[in-house]
Amino acid sequence: VLDRFRVAYRFDGMRREVLVHVYETVDEMQAAAKTYDGRDVPDAGAAFRGFGYWVPGGMPAESFNGPIGVVLLCRELTTVEVVSHEMTHAAMHAYESLKIGHPDDPLGEHFHGGNEAPAYFVGGWTANALLALSRRGYAVTIH
């Protein structure tokens, strides 16, 4: 691992964290991703691995304050699009597993296949919007 850190965001009174690990190569990132759940990601340049609906010791995830998962990146693909894409997977995992949404909300029924469609939209739209703003002379700030 080249680098590792945590990012956090507070929503509706709940602070949630995601671990971020950066690897030198795609191969190293893919090997690391496989250690979390045994699944290969042969076509991926980045990945998200959620820590599940329950945490060690049987504590419900809703009351757990630790990281909800890990985003695995490689040095050569740390673009806004890729990072936004993987953070979308993290957000969907938080929504689904931590019950941020209303318990009767059928949203989860529409996001199958690993949430790839919304992650691609968010990643692409975010990258293109930031590029357009930058080209027009706007300063894009963190907050």
Kindly label every feature range from the protein language model.
Residues 1-42:
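Short, charged/polar N-terminal "headpieces" of proteins
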Residues 18-22, 71-72, 83:
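Hydrophobic beta-strand residues in large extracellular and virion-surface proteins
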Residues 7, 60, 126-128:
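Residue-level detector of intrinsically disordered, flexible termini
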Residues 86:
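Walker B catalytic acidic pair
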Residues 76-81, 93-132:
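Post-HEXXH active-site segment of zinc metalloproteases
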Residues 26-78, 90-94:
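Active-site scaffold of zinc-dependent metalloenzymes
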Residues 131-143:
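Long, well-structured alpha-helical subdomains associated
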